[in-house]
């Protein structure tokens, strides 16, 4: 699919003979904003005694859609190689389904939703091809610190009618991806595809029927974004 996209983009570039924003690469600094869609999830490790606790049969994950809003500041370290700072907000949602075997041998599924509003501070490096008229492709890699402003880590489970899955309020992740730059008449438009892989275990182990059957939760997200850059 990637090669089909590359072929179609190159065909687009060949049809458009006028060179837009011809002086764009002569400036070292660029600024813009980003609108994104995310599908977030967890990478989960079960507890070692998972099969023998609480009549629990299965735990399944359901990725949920969310969205991202970011600002962009880019500096050219050298031709076609840029460092970018992209502070912003990420609205993420995940659902974990727990299937239990009841005393009458019926199965019951209980769902727990985990919502987060992250304040993100990503820094990444972008390696771009040379321009083909008004088109270029690129790869990126970097890291990100995230602070969950909707964290429920301090909720008292003893006072809650419905127990929740608690996660810590900060995360570190590695971002990898790529995209395409389109140089339009007045600004540069970019389409970007990126995966975000969390490093730390986010789970707070508070010995509820849900948390004690899980040993690790690490964040995972796929992000598609549109960048407007001047």
PLM segments and residue spans:
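Residues that define the transmembrane beta-barrel architecture of outer-membrane proteins
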Residues: 27-31, 63-67, 115-121, 135, ...
